From Swiss-Prot:
Recorded name of the encoding gene: Snrnp70
MF (Gene Ontology): RNA binding; U1 snRNA binding; U1 snRNP binding
Residue numbers bearing the N-acetylthreonine modification: 2
Protein name: U1 small nuclear ribonucleoprotein 70 kDa
Role played: Component of the spliceosomal U1 snRNP, which is essential for recognition of the pre-mRNA 5' splice-site and the subsequent assembly of the spliceosome. SNRNP70 binds to the loop I region of U1-snRNA.
Gene source species: Mus musculus
């Protein structure tokens, strides 16, 4: 395509001119020739010293030997200083040590932000405090992290010594001990090689990380050897964490238990309500069945009475004339009376003492003997209620007659009858051997 371009554009694509050749300024390395070549040292061996005449070499110390030497020199120098200061140290003549040493408590590992008033509030719970002395640095004026507390009574100091060790103040657990400088013979502070704990015995292999007072009296009640203080404190912290965790678990379990109890009570209430509803429905069904059973029983007794009257009605109907008129015939206990139909004066097919009548009597006696005690009690209660209502109704009629003089016309056609007539009307039997209906029930005639 470029060959079809015009010349002015083809000139833009033309190659550059080649670089002009210039001769090198010096020869190449392989072309150089040295005028003085290297040679050996054999001519100079006779000029060396004899190795047998040389002095022995001096041995220089290594880095490890130098560090060990400096450490040893430092320990020796520190021991000399401690011995010098120990000769001058007298705790009984210390101007900073004031008050009774047997009432003074030593508190270490105090937070640098803790004030004297805070210490007083924390340690006044064990007894009245006489004086608190917090130690500060003489050069910078900053707190050193320990203090001395003097109580008014020695028993309060012992109580604080026993119970305040390990107490957390401003986020740090303090160490509580007695003042040993003036109370323990031969006691030396830590700066003079004494003190408590094993954090400055030597290297990391012999030092312990946490230290505290060696109070073996706190472990007298426990069997076996007394544990180390820092391990005991760690165990106490772990025990506290476990107790707090158990308390939280118990609280959660209590909340779940209360929730379960509420759900259980709700389910129990629903269950009781359903059971009561079922019982009510069962009671209704039972009452309905009982009413239907009573109705069937009344119908059965009515049929039996009719059958008795129909079967044994020939014995006593001859003299009555069959029609009856105004007299009300009372059936006898044996069931003899005027039959409902048939000519008067005729006896039954077998007579009053036939085998059919005797069989009916046996069946009736058997049915009566098989009646349950509950039915008899119900019948007696019903009869008693009827008698009571009948007596109340009779007394009300008597009062009405006494007030109205017999002319009020409220006796429904019975005002012409006397008390005997009304009683006879109330006691009259029906045509089927039952008393007159009252309150919807047919009463069976009482046996004479």
């Amino acid at each position: 395509m470029t060959q079809f371009l015009p010349p002015n554009l083809l000139a833009l694509f033309a190659p550059r001119d080649p670089i002009p050749y210039l001769p090198p300024l010096e020869k190449l390395p392989h072309e150089k020739h040295h005028n003085q070549p290297y040679c050996g040292i054999a001519p100079y061996i006779r000029e060396f010293e004899d190795p047998r005449d040389a002095p022995p070499p001096t041995r220089a110390e290594t880095r490890e030997e130098r560090m060990e030497r400096k450490r040893r020199e430092k320990i020796e120098r520190r021991q000399q200083e401690v011995e010098t200061e120990l000769k001058m140290w007298d705790p009984h003549n210390d101007p900073n040590a004031q008050g009774d040493a047997f009432k003074t408590l030593f508190v270490a590992r105090v937070n640098y932000d803790t004030t004297e008033s805070k210490l007083r509030r924390e340690f006044e719970v064990y007894g009245p405090i006489k004086r608190i002395h917090m130690v500060y640095s003489k050069r910078s004026g900053k707190p050193r992290g320990y203090a001395f507390i003097e109580y008014e009574h020695e028993r309060d100091m012992h109580s604080a010594y026993k119970h305040a060790d390990g107490k957390k103040i401003d986020g740090r657990r303090v160490l509580v001990d007695v003042e040993r400088g003036r109370t323990v013979k031969g006691w030396r502070p830590r700066r003079l090689g004494g003190g408590l704990g094993g954090t400055r015995r030597g290297g990391a292999d012999v030092n312990i990380r946490h230290s505290g007072r060696d109070d073996t009296s706190r472990y007298d009640e426990r069997p076996g050897p007394s544990p180390l203080p820092h391990r005991d404190r760690d165990r106490d912290r772990e025990r506290e964490r476990r107790e707090r965790s158990r308390e939280r678990d118990k609280e959660r379990e209590r909340r779940r238990s209360r929730s379960r109890d509420r759900r259980r009570r709700s389910r129990s209430r629903d269950k009781d309500e359903r059971r009561r509803s079922r019982e009510r429905s069962k009671d209704k069904d039972r009452d309905r069945k009982r009413r239907s059973s009573r109705s069937r029983e009344r119908a059965r007794r009515e049929r039996e009475r009719k059958e008795e009257l129909r079967g044994g009605g020939g014995g006593g109907g001859g003299g009555s004339g069959g029609g009856g008129g105004g007299d009300m015939a009372e059936p006898s206990e044996a069931g003899d009376g005027a039959p409902d139909d048939g000519p008067p004066g005729e006896l039954g097919p077998e007579g009053p003492d036939g085998p059919e009548e005797k069989g009916r009597d046996r069946d009736r006696e058997r049915r009566r003997s098989h009646r349950s005690e509950r039915e008899r009690r119900r019948d007696r209660d019903r009869d008693r209620d009827r008698e009571h209502k009948r007596g109340e109704r009779g007394s009300e009629r008597g009062r009405d007659e006494a007030r109205g003089g017999g002319g009020s016309g409220q006796d429904n056609g019975l005002e012409g009858l006397g008390s005997d007539g009304r009683d006879m009307y109330m006691e009259a039997e029906g045509g089927d051997g039952y008393m007159a209906p009252e309150n919807g029930y047919l009463m069976e005639a009482a046996p004479e």
